[in-house]
Each structure stands twice: as C-alpha cells, then as structure tokens.
Amino acid sequence: MASIRDVARKANVGSATVSRVLNNSGYVSEETRRKIEDAMRELNYTPNELARNLFHKKSGIIAILVPSVSHPFFAELVKCVETELYARGYKTMLCDTFREKNSEQEYLDMLNRNIVDGIITGVHSLRIEEYTKIDKPIVAFDRCLGENIPLVRVDHALGGRMAAKLLLASGCKDVIQFQGAKSVRSPSDIRHIEFERVMKENNAKVTSVELMWNRFDSEYFSEVTEQTMREHPDIDGVFGADLLAVYCMKAAIAQGRQIPGDLKLVAYDGTYVTDAVTPGITSIVQPIPLIARELAGLLHDMIEQRPIPQREKLMNVSIRYGNTTIGKN
C-alpha cells in the first residue's frame, strides 16, 4: 500500500507538500498540485481519512438521535438522512433513545468532546438547557430546543385541519384521535388542537386518547387501540399516526365493522405501512425525503460555519387518498 512518502518521491516533492494538498492547507502551485494528484492516481494512493479528520479537528461522523428505529416514520427518516449525509461526505452513528435510557446525554457529551461533528435529534428526554448550553452544531426535527438550534418541521396545523375535513366530508360525527403525552410539549401538538377545533365547529364529537410518553412499540399500539375500540364501539372515525390507524382498522374488522362504511380512518405520517394494508389508509403525508434534505443541509452549513438565516424551516404536508374515507381516491 502506497504511503505519503511514496507519493512525494513519485512527484519529486517533499512529504509536507503532499500533506498540504491532502489537507487543502497552505499554498501549493497548480503545477505541483497536478503532479501530486497524478502520482496519487498512479500509485492508487488512498488518504488516511482518520488522520485527515484529526488534522481538521473533525471526525466526519454525525449522530442521529431518534426515539425508536422500529417506528416506521423514524425508520424512513433515518434512512433518508443517512443518504443525504453520505452525499455530503459524512458517516452516521445511530442512537435509539427508547432502548438506551442515558444515550441522549452521552451523545451530547460526545459532541462536546469532538467525537462527532454534529447531532440531528428527534428526541427530547433531556431538559432544553442541556442543549442550549452547548455551542456546537445541532439541528432538531419537530423539537423546540431553543432559538439558537435550527428546527425542521411540517405545518402540523394544516395537517390537523386536513384530517378533520376528510372525516367531516365522509360524514363522521363521533371520532377518536390519538395524541402524545401532554406532559411533553412538541410542535406536533397543534395538529390535535386544530383537528379538534375544526371537528367541534362542525358539531362533531371528539374523544382524545392520550398515549404514554416515549412508547413507540407495536405491542403498546396494539394494546391501546384494541382497548379504545372496545370502549368506544359507536365511533365512526379515527385520526392517529400510521401504526395507530392500522391497528384500529385491524380491531374494527375483528369486531365485524366495515371500512369505510362503519368506520373511517385518517392516518398521519404517510409511511409505507398505510399502503401495505387492505384497504389502503387515507393519510396526511409528511415529506420525509425533503425533511431529511433540510436536516442534513442545515447541519452541514453549521459545521462549515455558514450563516443560517432561517432558524425554522416549515414544510407542507399533503393528502394521499386511500380507501378508508369517502370521496376522492
């Protein structure tokens, strides 16, 4: 395997000159740079990435923090973020905070020690102060972590109104909506507020089912939806995240109810699971690939110390029609 010294001998320059080219530091004439690059190609020289990162005081690694990688939304988001970061020259380190209780703090410590170059976080187990006291590149998804930490989110208010109008247009008058724990504030809370407001303005009854905090596993979703459908046999509509809508539909069919005749459903997120069931579920879709691009782009700009003129990036949601509502499909 060729070394820097081999490249230097081939190009008839000193090792320090080769190092300056590799690290893009200091002056090297264009003619000398071309000679060194030609020598590297001829010798099939591969730079030591670790050494180069240490020189620049960078690791080339980004930590991605999510509550659960088994949750369809976060699984798709992680996949897309990894792709976007790789295109920008970064490797990723994944943290599932549901399984590792102290990991959120540990990853912040790693950022402080320059083990990772930045963090993209979709969790908030820690106090906001733990984030705001760190002057390092951090970008948040759907979590308000202070005015200095950029936030990427969708227009949840619009999503809530869309869902309500879909169920109202389908004739719903008595609906259930599933929402996160009220003890934890999130930008997504507004979708439930708007959903309830629009439904009640149209004389529909809304029952909100509060979910346990930080539970994203299928077993819990199955249990809570079966219990809800058992306790509310007369509801005619459901609004909830993808998996919740899927399990509600499963429970309703087991009860002998017809979809969408007896029960209409609107899911929120629009991941693959809403298309993988029969009938396909009408969904409010978060644009995961675009969200991932914004998260990766913002973090890359912060690492490169570029200005961030817009601290909050708001993205639109859309409707994907399935066969669980009545109307356009």
Enumerate the language-model features and the residues they cover.
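Hinge/beta->alpha junction and helix N-cap segments in small-molecule ligand-binding domains
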Residues: 67-76, 94-102, 152-162, 178-224, ...
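Periplasmic-binding protein-like
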Residues: 108, 116-122, 176-179, 232-243, ...
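Flexible loop/turn connectors
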Residues: 226, 230-239, 243-329
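N-terminal helix-turn-helix DNA-binding module of bacterial transcription factors
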Residues: 1-59, 73, 329
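Short acidic capping loops at alpha-helix termini that bridge into adjacent secondary structure
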Residues: 174, 206-208, 259-264
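Alpha-helical recognition/docking segments in bacterial nutrient-uptake
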Residues: 2, 60-165, 227-234
